[in-house]
Amino acid sequence: LREWRGGNSGHTRNLRCMHDAPQDVLVDAYPEEEYWQDLLKVTGGITNEKLARLVIRASSTCRDWMRKHGVHFQPPLSGALHVARTNAFFMGGGKALVNAYYRSAEKLGVQIRYNAPVDKLDIQDGQFVAAYVGNERITAKACVLAAGGFESNREWLREAWGQNERGEWPADNFLIRGTQFNQGVLLKHMLAHGADSIGDPTQAHMVAIDARAPLYDGGICTRIDCVSLGVVVNRDGQRFYDEGEDFWPKRYAIWGRLVAQQPGQIGYSIIDAKAIGRFMPPVFPGVQADTLPRSEEHTSEL
C-alpha cells in the first residue's frame, strides 16, 4: 500500500553518524572509536567488528548522498538535545525521509509498484532468474532484496524465543512498533536456497513501549523514555535492572528485551514530579497519583 511504503523507515526520526568535527546540525565530534565503543556496550560485545566499523565509517559520508536525494536535516527538538552531538534529525521525520526517496526514485525513472508483494523467487544454480507477484513472473538481470526482517512474523518469533521457565511464550505478548509487513517471506526463501545466515535471531533492536500501544505501527511516539529518570518494576513489584546504568540514548534499545524477560512481559516505570518535562512524553498519558499507595492502586487497575 502506498500509505505504508518505506517500512520501518517511516517511523524513524534521526541518524546516528560519525563525524570528526562540528557539522551543520551536529555539535562537537563523534569519532569512530567512541561510536564503536558505544555499540560494543549496547550489544554486550556480541557484534561483528568488521561489519560494524564499515557501517560506522559510511555514516560519516551518507548524509551528503541523502541530501542529494532531497532529505533535509534539523537540530534536535526539545527533549532530545542530549543527542545533538551524535544524531542528525530528519526534518519532517521518517515520513518526509521516505517521501523524499520516492520522489527521487521517480525522477530517476524507477517504476514503483504498490499492492505487489513478492511471493517467491526463481533461483537456478544460485543465480536469480525471476520474481513472482502472484502469477506474474518478472525477470531481471539482478535482484536486490530490501524486504526487511521477520519481526512481524509471530510464528517465527515464537520459534526464536521459545517458551520460558514460567511456561510463557514471550513472543505472544510482543507489540511491534514498526510495520506489520516484515514477515520474513523472502528471508526464509533465501535461507532455503542456501544463503548464509549470520547473527542471532533472538537479538533485536527492542525498546520498551507503552502496553496500550497498537499491535503494529505505533511508531516512536509509543516509546517509554522516562526509564532512566525513575525506577522500573515488574508486575511483582521487583526491580530487575539498573535504570541509570548509562546515558539513556545508549541504553534504551536494551529495555525491550529486559521487559520481555519479566512475568507477563510487562513492566512499570515510576517517576516523580521532578522528572516531568525531562523526557519525550509518549502518546498515552501516564497514571498520576499523590501517594505511593494510591500509585499502587492505579497500577493494579492497568
Question: Model regions: which residues?
Answer:
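Hydrophobic alpha-helical scaffolding
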Residues: A52, N87-K95, N173-Q180, T222, ...
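Glycine-rich loop(s) and the adjacent beta-strand/alpha-helix scaffold that form part
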Residues: I138-D210
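Small-residue helix-packing and pore-constriction motifs in hydrophobic alpha-helices
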Residues: C17, A21-Q23, L175, V287, ...
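Conserved N-terminal/central alpha/beta ligand/cofactor-binding core
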Residues: E3-Q111, P117-K120, W156-E159, Q163, ...
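Charged, often glycine-rich, active-site loop that binds/positions anionic groups
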Residues: A84-G94, A130, A213-C221
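Conserved beta-strand-loop-beta-strand element in the redox core of flavoprotein oxidoreductases
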Residues: L121-R137, C143
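An anion/pyrophosphate-binding glycine-rich loop and adjacent beta-alpha core
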Residues: Q183, L187-H189, H193-E296, S300
